[in-house]
């Protein structure tokens, strides 16, 4: 596949669950998209609590705390970011964003896939469109079919890349959002693909067959 950065293993620890011994807490508050981008580049492994997540909209979507009222109502995207013609249009879009129940997640763990000390729920890969194509073809190698993608350019790495994949058990492809493309080093020519852990072995074996030798 010739990735230039690591696939990122992400695990959602349910409320009341225990954080494994030996994994350290992140050393500064950041957005989920920033955390994924940091891990893919630095090779660090850590966990985060709700207070470590700067973007409360992304954290709320992943069940870490609650969705901020101004985000859920559409006010933030309508009046703040001015990305919709009406607040109703913003609200409808946010209602459709994949999310977990509020306060259902205790912590979130991050690690480069190749050195993860835990079994992830989702593997997030940030790569070029061609590499997304190869990952898609690898997934299709065994049984065929199609990848169905759904996104709105909102809450991309959190909702589309993790929550949707976690809930549905299907691969998700997304294009990033204003936040993730502002606060990270994700390049204009990169996309995001989320792979549920249950399908990772099929993707890996398919890659061995279809990737150019």
PLM features: residue spans?
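Acidic, serine/proline-rich low-complexity intrinsically disordered regions
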Residues: 2-213
